[in-house]
């Protein structure tokens, strides 16, 4: 018999061709297309969501009233945008401000971008509330009222934040009035030495911070863990420092973001990053996790310890290295997130009797 000239692969090719046109394959192919389309639509929908954050920090949680005694900040985070100047997702007044801050925009293309606008206040006091005279061996009274503009650029597992905070230190920051209001409300004794506070001075601080993330089993509702590192720097007459640190989280439905936010510059990192985040599922999904974090700073300037920049004022001997350690818990339900952290801070100046601690409460809503 003549030898067959048919290719040894012809049977396999015919089988593949028949499989590709079979009804079962077409059915699964169409289902896959629909699934991809729905995921893409969900991705587009989540990019249109805004995030509003409220932070309240106070040493009342530690039953003290001294050093960094109170802080509050309200932050508004935009949806993902293509650029900071032309995006119609941003109000006109924000785009106009952004045109003057192009240095902070960065040059990377095709990444997720967000604009952050914030307003806040921080208050610092010495330990002795009854002393009306200047206390030489304790920190100055000071208030800091500020507005911030930040720009975030996100890649998978990475976040870069550039933020500029501008405001005023001194009586114009209304630190005394804010503290007196709260103390009257709660029936606490007032601090009597506010006449010795730092003088009025315009303040600014520019911050860059880079974060990177390593995850394990954090998607869906499973138990998971992740680790988030950060490093950055701050320059300004209010603060100048180098910093580095990390956060470790473990729990159920850990949010797909870059950790637990704080009032410190560059600390805004809780914006949802993908459709897998519990706040984007649309079915009131819940999540619960605990976290431990630390931040180590090499401090070159701190107006709240070094005193006024251009005028003679009270000052203390600042420590060059300061560390924060925080432990806390965070709960998510639907688009809302509530977190509490207790922060332990090492001594900030040599005359300080002991380390300081305070509580930080954060409420975030994505809508």
Annotated model-derived regions:
Residues 43-82, 114-129, 297-305, 321:
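Short glycine/proline- and aromatic-enriched beta-strand/turn motifs that initiate or cap beta-hairpins
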Residues 51, 127-128, 247, 253-367:
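Outer membrane beta-barrel transmembrane domains
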Residues 43-49, 80-113, 154-161, 214-227, ...:
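Short loop/turn motifs that connect adjacent beta-strands in outer-membrane beta-barrel proteins
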Residues 132-137, 191-196, 232, 311-315, ...:
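Extracellular loop and loop/strand-boundary signature of outer-membrane beta-barrel proteins
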Residues 66-72, 141-145, 160, 200-206, ...:
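Residues that define the transmembrane beta-barrel architecture of outer-membrane proteins
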